[in-house]
Amino acid sequence: MLLFDRDGEYWVILNKRTQKVEHHKGEICFPGGRKDMLDKDLTETALRETWEEMGVDPSNVSVLGILGKTETTTGYEITPTVGLISYPYQFNIHNDEVEEVIEMPLSCLFLKDTRRYEAKLLEGEVIVQPAFHYENNMIFGATARILNNFACLIDSRNLEEPA
C-alpha cells in the first residue's frame, strides 16, 4: 500500500488492472504479487512487485509497516506492506498489468458518498463487506477490506457501520 503526502493530506495509490492479466481483470488493487524464491521476506516482495508494476524504485519507498493478512476469494493470502513515497512521483507502469494509476485521498475512506457496504453471495452465504466508490471506480473485495482495516487503524470513530 503506497501512500504519499499532497499538501498535508495523505493519499493512497491504487492500480486498475488491464484485461491482459490472468486474474482480477479490470479490478482496482494495490501493486503486489507472489513471493519469489529470491525475496528474503514479504516486504522485499512488495517492493519488487511495486518496482515491476509501477517503476517505483525500492530506495524511494519508506516502509512504515505491515498490516494483518487478508484472504481473497480466489485463495490468495495478502500481507499488505505500507510504504510512503514522495509526491509527485513519475510512475513507469507496466502496460500489460496496469491500465491506470488511481490516486485516492485517504479521507475518502470516511465519506458517506464514497463508503458502501456490498452484499455478496459466496458459497451459499451472504457476506456483507465494505466497498468504496471513487471517480467512477468501484473498489471491492480484498482491496476494500484492506482499505477498511487501514481506516480502522487511522480512526475507527469516523467509520459508519452497515445498516
Residue ranges and their predicted role:
Residues 20, 34-135, 139, 149-163:
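Unchanged
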